[in-house]
């Protein structure tokens, strides 16, 4: 163990005393995550990390609390297991109701990214390489809203932002590249809810669909200021089910009473 030595001079007595103090906490300088997605492609959007930390267990942000990561890259030091769904203990961060997380990069070595147990707020949170999901709302009341402002995600085989609770998920000024679905309302949870998505200022590249919603449960997705390149569908509707053994069935795509946007809301780059 390293120690800092403090020398206290007692000139009147002609003596010196040595006191051992524990070292300050250290954050390992991160290997470069900048400009790297999980598939090896490059992007100028992922910010440089200020360090890295592999957590031995999920870091919980208490109800109403906040955590500012200072752009450190956090993960769990484990390999991604693909689309095999993990649980809360596999997440990097778990945010209790009313909590907030800001200025964090979720590194590539994890199974689950961030779990939200009630309305929460994410500001400038980035995912270097998505595993099963980048972010999941596990619980939320019908009248509540979770807010994601800024940040981005890269290299998602399927979903980026998953909504399993009720109420609204609002996402603004978010970048996503190489993905399956940016947002998805759970299609076959044991308990199904009406869910709403508000997407504004999204820049999306190389993906299947921006939003997947269940119109038979009253879901809606509203889009404004969207810029896309290589994205197949803006909004896809499904017939959801509360039978976890069944898969939801796609039943439509494009503007509708459920998928709310016009051609002026979407710009192709």
Set out the residue ranges of the language-model regions.
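Fungal secretory targeting signals
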Residues: 1-23, 28
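Short stretches within intrinsically disordered, low-complexity N-terminal or propeptide regions
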Residues: 12-14, 32, 223
């Amino acid at each position: 163990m390293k120690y800092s030595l403090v020398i206290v001079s007692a000139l009147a007595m002609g003596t010196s005393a040595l006191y051992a103090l524990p070292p300050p906490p250290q954050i390992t300088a991160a290997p470069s995550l900048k400009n790297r997605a999980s598939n090896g492609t490059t992007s100028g959007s992922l910010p440089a990390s200020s360090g890295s930390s592999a957590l031995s267990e999920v870091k919980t942000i208490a109800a109403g609390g906040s955590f500012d990561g200072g752009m450190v890259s956090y993960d769990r030091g484990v390999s991604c297991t693909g689309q095999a769904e993990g649980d809360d203990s596999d997440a990097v961060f778990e945010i209790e109701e009313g909590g907030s997380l800001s200025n964090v990069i979720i590194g590539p070595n994890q199974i689950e990214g961030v779990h939200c147990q009630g309305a929460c707020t994410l500001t400038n949170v980035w995912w270097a390489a998505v595993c099963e999901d980048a972010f999941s709302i596990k619980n939320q009341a019908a009248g509540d809203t979770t807010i994601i402002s800024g940040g981005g995600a890269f290299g998602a085989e399927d979903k980026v932002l998953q909504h399993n609770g009720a109420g609204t998920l609002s996402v603004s000024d978010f970048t996503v590249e190489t993905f399956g679905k940016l947002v998805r309302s759970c299609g076959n949870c044991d308990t199904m809810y009406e869910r709403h998505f508000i997407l504004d200022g999204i820049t999306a590249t190389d993906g299947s669909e921006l939003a997947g919603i269940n119109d038979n449960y009253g879901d809606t997705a509203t889009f404004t200021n969207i810029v896309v390149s290589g994205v197949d569908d803006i909004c896809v509707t499904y017939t959801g089910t509360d039978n976890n053994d069944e898969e939801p069935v796609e039943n439509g795509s494009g503007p509708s009473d459920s998928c709310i946007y016009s051609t002026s809301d979407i710009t192709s780059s």
